[in-house]
Amino acid sequence: MRFRPATLLASLLFAAAAGPTLAQTSVPSASSATSTRLDPTARAAIVAQLATELRSRYIYPDVGEKGAAAITAAAASGAYDRLTDLPSFARRLTDDLRGVLHDKHLAVFGETNRPAISVASIPGGEAGIVRADRLAGGIAYLEIAGFSNPWSFKPALDRAMAGLKGSRAVILDMRGNHGGDPASVSYLVSHFVPAGKRIEINRIVWRKAGTRDLTRKPFFSERTPVSFAGLPVYVLIGGHTFSGGEELAYDIQTLKLGTLVGETTGGGANPGQSFPIGHGVMAFIPTGRAESPVTGSNWEGRGVQPDIAVPDADALATALRRLGQSPAAATISPVSVFTQRAVPLRGSEAMLRRLLAGRAAPEPDYTLLAADTGEPGRAAFAATHRRLQPLGDPQAIHFRRPDGFGFDEFTLVYPDQTLLVAIELDPSGKFRGLIGPDKVSP
């Protein structure tokens, strides 16, 4: 499950359009659709299917009904008649629905779009971990841009935390964190829970499609190789902290494990999933909500409030002062204790080569697809296949880096160009998603 803001990545959400367990990290840009022209019949069909999906799946049934009614009425009034290109239509549907639902995760976008975020602009740092430094005064500093899937996040975090062992305080920088998998969020929080104590950190409430029935998936603290329980913990937050990044801050605050410093966060707490709605269009629909076991609520629509309110640019300096250190401690003699891996995960290059080798087939080989991705995953895989079909055989394939979303990035070398792609597999080696291909700038 994943949370991400609307300014990020149709490509990732669409690439990783797995089941709801993936849905809390990424939200597509409404403007990331293709330039397909839409006739009145296509527009009517898209609105009708989107309304059906909202009524069946949106986490709050009554609110979903209001959204469905709003776009149905708008279509009947002729409000969409002049929106003949897919990007404009997708943007208008997104805006209309957000005006009713007030949900920053919801978005409509084109399934065969060029990625809303290029591979080259994906945050660096293995599995979302950008930096792990030991600052002056024995202060551990950890910057995390996102929470990737737990099978890539946990080993990377374990290496970072091992290097920070023995610190007297911890600063977690979430100011640029746009979300991720709640299992990975809970694993980070577990480092600050007293050893031997198992507590419920968060839960996700899911709506069963077509009903008003709800299920709850709890996330508990886990044993970690290194513990920082009892140490002063400061979490830096700001307006760009969103979704899973907000969950980390909310968990730390409600469980009284640390202090939040900075500005109020973005306010997105409803995870979801992308669904095909016809004519090359997808909709990301929140099908769940976060629920704190402490408050019974979450941060949706209002954000997480800091304990110490300062401009987010001043948050690190403020935390350092609270710890008795000069703000210069952030730049004087930091010692990096984390080096990202320099080799691809097992199977990622082989899977990429297999996808390229099969690109001429009319349909992708669905036996390669992770089992839990469902129909949205099949649609995403088909779109990936279509994006790869125009490519020739690369002269060479080179591993570039692990990225901040838990994907492995590769360059595809051709005589006249070099392309970037990023691929994600599940723990069993099955395909979960691909971003790109994107041209490498000269």
What are these regions (language model features)?
Residues 179-232, 270-276, 288-293:
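Gly/Ser/Thr-rich loop/hinge elements
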Residues 67-73, 355-376:
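Short, well-ordered alpha-helical segments enriched in acidic and aromatic residues
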Residues 50, 97, 142, 172, ...:
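Terminal peptide-recognition signature
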Residues 112-115, 146-150, 176-182, 198-199, ...:
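Solvent-exposed loop/turn segments at secondary-structure junctions
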Residues 382-429:
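Surface-exposed, charged secondary-structure patches
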Residues 34-46, 326-357:
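Short, low-complexity N-terminal intrinsically disordered segments enriched in polar/charged residues
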Residues 92-166, 213-214, 284, 298-330, ...:
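C-terminal, low-ordered peptide segments at domain boundaries
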Residues 61-137, 376, 380-398:
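Extended, small/polar residue-biased N-terminal targeting/export presequences
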